[in-house]
Structures are given as structure tokens and as C-alpha cells.
A protein has these predicted regions:
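Post-Walker A helix-loop "phosphate-sensing" segment adjacent to the P-loop in P-loop NTPases
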Residues: 233-239
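Peripheral, non-AAA+ core regions of ATP-driven protein-machinery
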Residues: 1-226, 232
């Protein structure tokens, strides 16, 4: 099969939009081109991917390789697409099966040796991956962050061979257990310690309850810092 599709996620603040990595192998002079609004780090991934594939004892196809990162209008940055690109090339060239790829989303930077390096924004990715009913595959370096997503299925590996071994069924990876995080309110000064200042305290309570902005103006010594230091103690939990 000369076409393979692998799923990944971009990083956009706390969002992780889906990126479809399409790899097509065609006859012609050997080349590798990446399209789909890639940044510099993504364009440089072709050299990292080539070295990782060769050093993992796979063959790098001597064909014309086109890699499309869709959607085309979404900027792609970082080395997080190294792993899905490498897996797409291996799948399109028939070196690994394509049947299990639709069930996973991959993100990892590749070293030239084939080792997986950590990337930023793994937690938003694992949350979105779980919502899409897929399993996230991340570097071992990001395993602790990825398991914060609760019941989301997460697989972690240290090398490209770990991932290909799982996809081929030779050496399946064990899903990581979810980490339970308990919320703990920080120790804050108590607003009840403030004597008087009834109007100011009332303003703090209204701002905290309604999520309003608050501006304190006044000469030194009138209690602005005293009141501000006690505001966190009456704020509701973050969503």
C-alpha cells in the first residue's frame, strides 16, 4: 500500500486540534516533501525521521515521498510529528501493518538513534484523544503528564522499535494506569481577620462570586494589600 494515514495532535495553547498525517509513496526520483503549513522544526523532521528509520533497522524507501499535514490552514510546529511521520512512511512502504493505526494518536520527537524524546502539550492531547475514543502513544518522558488525563488509555515507549513492536503485535505495550489527583486548596489568609472595611469586603465578595475584575485605589496604609491577600481564600474552585 503506497498511502498511509496516521493521527496526531497539534499544540495550540490548551487546545489540541487533530492533525491527520497523510503519507504517499510514488514512483520518481527519491525525495521527501512535507506540505500543510509546517514550521521550521517540522520541515527539519525529514532528516531526523530518515536517521531514526535507518538506525532502527528498517529500510527508508527510495521513492518520491509526500507528507501532508492536514488541515492545511493550521500551523504545525515542534518535533511532535516525527513519530507519526515515521510510522506513516513505514506503513506506506509495507514494513508495518496499517490496520491498527486508526485506533491511536501519536506524538513524539525522534532522535537519530530512534529514541523517543518528550514534547510539550501532552496533557491536552491525551484529553482530546480520550474524547475521540482513541489511545494516545507518547514518549516515556511524557508518561507522568499523560496519565493525568484520568481514564484515558495511554501507551508510552522509549524507542521507535517499541511502537512498531506494539503495532505488529510482536511486543505489545502495557497501558499506563491513570493517576488520581486530589485537589487541595492552598493555605490563604482569612477575610474574617479584616476588621471594619465593610464596603471593601462586600466588593471583594461580589467580585469573587461573580468573577468580576477588581481595581483597588487608595493612599498607602488603607488596607489594599491586606484585602488583596485575602481574596484567594474566598475564590471558588477553578473549572
Amino acid at each position: 500500500m503506497s498511502l498511509a494515514i496516521v493521527y496526531s495532535r497539534a499544540q495550540c495553547g490548551m487546545e489540541a486540534p487533530l492533525v491527520t498525517v497523510e503519507v504517499h509513496l510514488a514512483n520518481g526520483l527519491p525525495s521527501l516533501s512535507i506540505v500543510g503549513l509546517p514550521e521550521t522544526a517540522v520541515r527539519e523532521s525529514k532528516d531526523r525521521v530518515r536517521g531514526a528509520i535507518l538506525n532502527s533497522r528498517f529500510e527508508f524507501p527510495t521513492r518520491r515521498i509526500t507528507i501532508n499535514l492536514a488541515p492545511a490552514d493550521l500551523p504545525k510546529e515542534g518535533g511532535r510529528f516525527d513519530l507519526p511521520i515515521a510510522l506513516g512512511i513505514l506503513a506506506a512502504s509495507g514494513q508495518i501493518p496499517t490496520t491498527r493505526l486508526p485506533h491511536y494518536e501519536f506524538a513524539a520527537e525522534l532522535a537519530l538513534s530512534g529514541e523517543l524524546r518528550g514534547v510539550h502539550g501532552i496533557l491536552p492531547m491525551t484529553l482530546k484523544t480520550a474524547a475521540a475514543k482513541r489511545t494516545a502513544v507518547v514518549p516515556r518522558e511524557n508518561a507522568a503528564e499523560a496519565t493525568l488525563a484520568g481514564g484515558a488509555g495511554v501507551l508510552a515507549g522509549c524507542h521507535l522499535l517499541d511502537i512498531t513492536g506494539h503495532l505488529t503485535g510482536v511486543q505489545p505495550l502495557v497501558p499506563l494506569p491513570a493517576r488520581q489527583v486530589t485537589a487541595r486548596r492552598p493555605d490563604c489568609a482569612d477575610l474574617a481577620d479584616v476588621r471594619g472595611q465593610h464596603h471593601a469586603r462586600r466588593a471583594l465578595e461580589i467580585a469573587a462570586a461573580g468573577g468580576h475584575s477588581l481595581l483597588m485605589i487608595g493612599p498607602p496604609g488603607t488596607g489594599k494589600s491586606l484585602l488583596a491577600s485575602r481574596l484567594p481564600g474566598i475564590l471558588p474552585p477553578l473549572d
